[in-house]
């Protein structure tokens, strides 16, 4: 879900805002107070603060949300940049990652590596911004393990601070063009929060970047794609599916003032969330993933997509 002004946190800057609309002018103090009240309300109800974009809601919450029928389902360009390419590096944050021996780290490295130049990555190629078209290629630089205690997903500033911590330590060198994407995988269970992941934008030391947050989804039915074919652990399969959602949204709608989303604020991943066309999609390195489709205006207009949960046939997965 697209949420879009700029709010500063010391040396950190996070893209902020509400669902795109033409609001009335207000005094800075009133605006700040309103934003703070909204953020606190969202955190108390298990939602991320209003800086988060592309929120991947759980199966149950997504099913209960308005389906978007009645108007045009097409996404439109709101005048911002896209990511013509990307550089990714994952952060595994939390005390339990130090002794972890499962398949999540190697699996997610494989997913990001194989995503580059895959047909799945090409599902976003039709979208353009002020800096050109989204391209299918990217470079994955592996991962970092930080065994300090992780925060949950209620505060985008806390997640950005973790990314900036790794920048300061020299573990991440942000892409100078603003095309760096740094997903943070925590060991914190979702609990009662109504979402599986989100992405946002900010800066570290004056360099713009994209980042994302993910809960530990082990045994989490609300965020489980129910993968029975790839051989991945349930926890990896759940993270892989929501990873596809967030990465493709970041590429087509990375930062203020925003690029591609529909009249309800839904980005390409939101519009096809929890819909799967085939049991698995093969990436460029041969790895296979049960992963949701992404919205394509072209597929919808040409009647070549498969239907989302609202019956709008604009989803594609490149299989």
Language model regions located:
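Metalloprotease/metallohydrolase-associated module, dominated by Zn2+-dependent proteases
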Residues: 195-237, 253-319
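Active-site recognition of the HExxH zinc-binding catalytic motif
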Residues: 241-253
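Bacterial signal peptide processing site
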Residues: 22-25
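Active-site-proximal segments of metallohydrolase catalytic domains
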Residues: 133-204
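C-terminal motif of bacterial Sec signal peptides marking the signal peptidase cleavage site
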Residues: 17-20
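Bacterial N-terminal signal peptides that target proteins for export
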Residues: 1-10
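N-terminal carbohydrate-binding/catalytic regions of secreted carbohydrate-active enzymes
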Residues: 41-164
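Loop/turn elements at helix/coil->beta-strand transitions in domains of secreted/extracellular proteins
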Residues: 84-88, 177-182, 207-210, 236
